[in-house]
């Protein structure tokens, strides 16, 4: 299975953050029951629990600005690892928060789903 992992990562990242920024409730289609999210130190498993966590975040408006995106194949089966860094603009805040996020995408038929998702805010030392 030959995958253009760079294009896949770019397309996935654009879709994911556009969806997150406009309507987080719709992100459930990207996860499965075996999917896991580590959000800061909280670990959740399953699409339902993951979306509940994302929807419960304490802000109304959010915008992700990507500064770096790296991807590489993760297995001979077509899995792809995606690492993103960027800025998070929350509500009307003028100072963005830095973040890092890693996705492990697994093939499913002709598409992919998020098997692992690790999110971390990056605070200055």
Swiss-Prot record:
It comes from the Eukaryota. PROSITE patterns: NTF2_DOMAIN. This is Nuclear transport factor 2. Keywords: Cytoplasm, Protein transport, Transport. GO terms for biological process: nucleocytoplasmic transport; protein transport. Residues 8-121 form the NTF2 domain. Its main location: cytoplasm. Pfam families: NTF2. It is found in: Cytoplasm. One of its GO terms (cellular component) is cytoplasm. InterPro entries: NTF2, NTF2-like_dom_sf, NTF2_dom, Nuclear_transport_factor_2_euk. Facilitates protein transport into the nucleus. Could be part of a multicomponent system of cytosolic factors that assemble at the pore complex during nuclear import.
